[in-house]
Amino acid sequence: MALDIHAHRILILDFGSQYTQLIARRVREIGVYCELHPFDMDDEAIREFAPKGVILAGGPESVHEANSPRCPQAVFDLGVPVFGICYGMQTMAEQLGGKVEGSELREFGYARVDVVGKSRLLDGIEDHIDADGLFGLDVWMSHGDKVTKMPEDFHILASTPSCPIAGMFSDERRYYGVQFHPEVTHTKQGGRILSRFILDICECEALWTPSKIAEDAIAQVRAQVGTDNVLLGLSGGVDSSVVAALLHKAIGDQLTCVFVDNGLLRLHEGEQVMAMFAENMGVKVIRANAEDQFLNNLAGESDPEKKRKIIGRTFIDVFDAQSNKLDNIKYLAQGTIYPDVIESAGAKSGKAHVIKSHHNVGGLPEEMNLKLVEPLRELFKDEVRRLGLELGLPYDMVYRHPFPGPGLGVRILGEVKKEYADLLRRADHIFIEELRKADWYHKVSQAFVVFQPVKSVGVVGDGRRYAWVVALRAVETIDFMTARWAHLPYELLETVSGRIINEIEGISRVTYDVSSKPPATIEWE
């Protein structure tokens, strides 16, 4: 009998680092299941989780300050390998009898560490070998404190001039700590270091693969749903599309999708969704044409937050009206993904609390009285995309740029009108089409056009044109928390601008947004 894909698992304890989710994604990429839990996870829960190894993540606090986070004692009682990263190394050192102090020289950014100890973790892994035969690694540092005394039976693993104990290890106990961040791409050998810990030291088997995830998710859905019927709000976005494909494969005609066409979608998006799911895959999809209802409700409103709420409430009204026409629906499917689950863990007094269910549809009427099916709730976004490909969805659909829930409603500044939406749809289509032609679409993380309710004078032929202004926006980012504006070639911008002004009569001027995040947000509203 094949092993359950969750059988070999890693526990990651979160001490508040901005990189913690990145650690989890790296572990999953290696092919091993892991879960992120708050540092104050109780001992019994840790024992029940039964990990094959534990990673103590970084954090912003100082170990030597009162009430700073500590690793649960149960971790050190499990008898499994432990890997402390940055703060994780410091709390491990302090809790096992070592000492941590503040450092006069803080290390932030690129650094080179010398590998001075022969350990299972770093044996044969290096970026440089100097004239004296000393191995070196190019790494990313982000710390102010440092370990000044190691626990008994530990040895120095790595060092820098300002941080003599930049890494420590005990091969006998299988405990390792590094002051740098192996999870970020700036640490060139980071992937190899994590693989060494997880596959070799923890002896995990790479069971977490797209094909096995698909098989497991299909089996789980069938076990949960049985012969009951399921309702899904299909938006055409990546998450809901993958849920639709997965559920259709699992339960076939027991699935009914409601696609709400709010009049704020991209050009031909409604037709594309229906063609993909209803025509090609045979999924039962109800298309609710609610453009007038959305636009009427939005009339006269220019406040961005109020527009979002109106769009959200109207979606619920339309979705509810459609669901009431259906019989014997017992389950509501949602595209909740793992970051949603993590983020819905509250934070009081700087301490994370128990993870609770996250409802990404947000506010669907409780009187619907439906049970939830969330087949993606264990997956990160990149895993959802790989699962989509595994299920047969087209690459271009799975790797589309993100599109906001309120759609063009937040890309039209001020009041939303049908005229504005129609102009914006066409301009956006031209921009994306030219990005694809120039092989830039997948080089940027997100690209779109923003409609500005400002008119500008233009000249077309011998005539004067007084028409609207639009802005092009393209950004590059890894995590969407920070982003830089994309340095698109001038020739490409010229082509896009020329096409928009020449082909769309209502637009006379095109600008390019050169704001990064922060201080600007990616979307304008």
Swiss-Prot record:
Keywords: ATP-binding, Glutamine amidotransferase, GMP biosynthesis, Ligase, Nucleotide-binding, Purine biosynthesis
Secretion signal, residue range per the UniProt entry: none
Residue stretches making up the GMPS ATP-PPase domain: 208-400
EC number per UniProt: 6.3.5.2
Reaction catalysed by this enzyme: XMP + L-glutamine + ATP + H2O = GMP + L-glutamate + AMP + diphosphate + 2 H(+)
Gene Ontology molecular functions: ATP binding; GMP synthase activity
First-level EC class: ligase
Recorded GO CC terms: cytosol
Pathway involvement of the protein, from the record: Purine metabolism; GMP biosynthesis; GMP from XMP (L-Gln route): step 1/1
Function noted in UniProt: Catalyzes the synthesis of GMP from XMP.
Protein name: GMP synthase [glutamine-hydrolyzing]
Species whose genome carries this gene: Pseudomonas fluorescens (strain SBW25)
Organismal lineage: Bacteria, Pseudomonadati, Pseudomonadota, Gammaproteobacteria, Pseudomonadales
UniProt gene name: guaA
